[in-house]
Regions:
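Catalytic toxin/effector domains delivered as secreted proteins or via bacterial secretion systems
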Residues: 21-24, 31-35
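Short, extreme N-terminal segment that most often corresponds to the first beta-strand
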Residues: 1-25
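Low-complexity intrinsically disordered segments
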Residues: 32-178
């Protein structure tokens, strides 16, 4: 069996917790980590838009990750869906405020994109679900590949998408998820 994931956002200012079930415009989207952690995935893009200039604690919680402190909070509710969006990470940075680091999205995309042979299609694994996942490696469909040991490295950290990195933060774009 494969492990399925839901996304949890926690706003420290308002204390609001949101649990997302990966539905986009009331349509089911694939739930395994490797199935939906793609650059142009509409669900992941909608989550990025929700944290645009609004830091949240972010966690992609697997249904096998029962050691997670809010496992029941995530898996005992249906969760909410998102609306499709045109939001993209072009020209933006993914910021981890707890660690005072950022990932330059344009650089990351250029380093990690892969072209389908004989096609113009570009594939790139999205760093946000991978960096914030808990439970990876326990089911089929989980990420196994380059920098696998870094999956979950930003789990439940305070993260936002910004146009510019904060001045005193360090560039950590050297992630290779392929």
């Amino acid at each position: 069996m494969g492990q399925y994931y839901k996304t949890r956002l926690f706003n420290e200012e308002t204390k609001e917790v949101l649990v997302f079930n990966r539905r986009v415009d009331d349509e089911y989207t694939w739930g395994k980590l490797r199935e939906h952690s793609w650059w142009f995935n509409p669900f992941v893009n909608a989550i990025c838009e929700k944290i645009y200039e609004k830091p949240h604690r972010v966690a992609w919680v697997g249904d096998y990750a029962d050691e997670c402190e809010f496992y029941e909070e995530v898996w005992n509710v249906d969760g909410i869906g998102v609306k499709s969006t045109d939001f993209l990470l072009d020209g933006k940075v993914l910021v981890n405020h707890d660690r005072k680091i950022y990932l330059d999205c344009d650089k990351y995309f250029k380093m990690n994109r892969v072209y389908d042979k004989g096609k113009l299609t570009v594939w790139c694994l999205h760093p946000l679900p991978l960096l914030t996942a808990i439970g990876n490696g326990r089911g089929s469909g989980d990420y196994r590949g380059t920098d696998e040991n870094l999956v979950g490295d930003w789990y439940n950290d305070l993260i936002s998408v910004e146009m510019q990195p904060p001045l005193d933060y360090k560039d950590c774009t050297d992630y290779h998820f392929k």
